[in-house]
Amino acid sequence: MISEAPVETCNQFVFLAFPRRPGWKPKGEQPGQVLCTRPSGRGKMKLAASNNSLLCFSFNLLWSAAMNHRAAGLTHFGMQHDDIIPPLEWVDILVDDLEASSADVISSVVPIKDDRGITSTGVRNWLTGEIRRLTMHEIFQLPETFTIEDVHAAGINADPNGNPADEYLIVNTGLWVCRFDRPWAKKFPGFRTQDQVRIDADGRCEAVSLSEDWLFSEWAARNGLSVLATRKAALGHWQDGKEYRNDSAWGTCQTDPGEVVKVT
C-alpha cells in the first residue's frame, strides 16, 4: 500500500495523449459526457491526439511527440483512450499517488466490456507465461492503489506453483500516467503487440496474443520500474451507451475463469 499523502507541486507539466480511431467519435466528448475536457486543475499541459487505426503506431506517434518535447520541461506523460470516461482532474489524482510513492507508472483499473467484471489488470509469471486477471470483486479486496506486493499479500498469484518473485503487475493503458523526467523514459523502445498462430496440444491451430499494455508492463518490470494500479480515479469504460465502471465490486465472476492462452 502506498502513502495517502497528497503532493503539492508547481512544476507539473503533463503531455496528455489521446489516441483516436478514424471515424470514431469519443463518447466522452459528447454533450453530457464532457468530464474528460478538464483533466487537470494545476500546472501545465500539452495535449496531442493521433488518428490512426494501427494501435501501437498511434501510441508510438504520441510517445515520440512527447519525447521530442521533453526538453521543454515535461514531468509526466499521460494517456486517455477514446472509450474511457474519467472524473474531473483525473491527471492530478494519478500524479498525486505517483509522487507520494515515488513510483514510475500508475494505471487505472479498467473493466472489460461485459457483465463478468473482469479487468485487464492482473499478474503474469514471465517464466511460465501464466496470467491471472483481477476481477472487480478482487479489486475491492485490495488497497485503493496497489502494487504487485499487495496482490501477493491477498493470496493472488498468476501461477500457484511458481515463484512470486517471477511475477509482475500487468496494467492497462486506458487511463494512465508515468514519470517522464526519469532516464528510463528515453530507453523505452515503444509499444508493440505479440501475435501468432500456433498448434496446440491437440494439433489444432490457435491464435494467441499479448497486448501492448501487458508487454509494456513486462518491459517496465524487467527494467526495474515501480508500477501501481488504482481505482482512485473512478471511470467508465464506454460501450453502446453503457459504462462498465471501476468504482464498485460487481460482475458474475469472482475470479478469472482462466481463458487467456499463455504466451511464453
Regions found by a protein language model. Give the residues of each.
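Conserved catalytic core of nucleotide-sugar-dependent glycosyltransferases
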Residues: 87-199
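Active-site-proximal specificity loops/subdomain of glycosyltransferases
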Residues: 25-75
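Short, high-confidence coil segments that cap the C-terminus of an alpha-helix
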Residues: 74, 102-103, 225
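Short beta-strand-to-loop acidic/aromatic patch adjacent to the donor-nucleotide binding site
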Residues: 73-85
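C-terminal catalytic/acceptor-binding lobe
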Residues: 9, 170-172, 182-264
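Anion (oxyanion) recognition and catalysis
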Residues: 40-41, 99, 221
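Short, well-formed alpha-helical segments that are part of the catalytic scaffolds
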Residues: 1-13, 18, 22-39
